[in-house]
Amino acid sequence: MKAIKEFLGYLIGGILFVGLIPSIMWFFSGKPSLFPSNTLRIIVGAILVAIGLATSVWSIVYMRYKGNGNPMDAFGHEIAPRTVHLMTDGPYRLSRNPMLTGTFIYLSGICVWLLTWQSFLIFVLFIAIMLVQVRTEEKRLQRDFGEEYEIYRNHVGRFLPLTLFKHKD
């Protein structure tokens, strides 16, 4: 049962973040060409997409093997087995939410490709929803890991590794 739950967590996450959100952005952007003539836009968008996907995949793989769990936890509801160890190294030494940081970079690449206000609006809406999700997740991490999480939270930014941009609650 745990293996099925874990598989479903990865499947749902992949479909949602890599497929559904970009498809919604494309659909509501008036369905522009997927291969616009602006070469620079294609290159910049592709670089952002690649960096974002690589960051997210690194974080997911790291969580699976180091944290012994799965990232799919939605608004306090366990969709797949939760991690049993707090991860503070690897990609998690740079950001408390490197999967989302990668997803934000990936979706910004999609926005560059589409270059429409609709895709940007959907991107901003997605960020707002994820901020609510992250706050819910942080409460759970505080409950599960206590002082260890508190120390980690005070030293690592929510999304960005730069102390200047670190969000302190």
What residue spans do the PLM features occupy?
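Membrane-anchoring alpha-helices and their flanking helix-loop junctions
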Residues: M1-D89, T101-D169
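Histidine-centered phosphotransfer motif of kinases
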Residues: L94-T101
